[in-house]
Swiss-Prot record:
GO CC annotation, single: membrane
Protein name: Transmembrane protein 069R
Keywords, comma-separated and alphabetical: Host membrane, Membrane, Transmembrane, Transmembrane helix
Location of the protein in the cell: Host membrane
Transmembrane segments: 30-50, 67-87
Length: 88
């Protein structure tokens, strides 16, 4: 069986420009909240470990705490954006 016949049987088609734009828009909407949460956790990790203030008060922040900050910010963003239907 030829490849084109197989693709027709599977109803596979090449997306047009509008569909491609819709797909890229959905991916962009789904990726920015985790990226923002990661940036916030990196900033919190910097403040609590290296810090611009130079004191040793935050040197004990562990990797588990950084993951907690990341997950907390991610959950806050998820709740702030609503039910999550905009991620789909």
């Amino acid at each position: 069986m030829e490849r084109s016949a197989t693709l027709e049987m599977l109803n596979v088609h090449k997306p047009d420009a509008r569909q491609t734009g819709d797909i890229l828009s959905r991916y962009a909407n789904a990726l920015w909240p985790p990226a923002l949460a990661y940036a916030a956790s990196v900033a919190a990790g910097y403040v609590f470990t290296a810090g611009p203030h130079g004191c040793r008060c935050g040197k004990a922040m562990t990797e588990a705490a950084r993951v907690g900050v990341f997950l907390g910010v991610l959950c806050a963003l998820y709740n702030w954006m609503g039910s999550g239907d905009s991620f789909a």
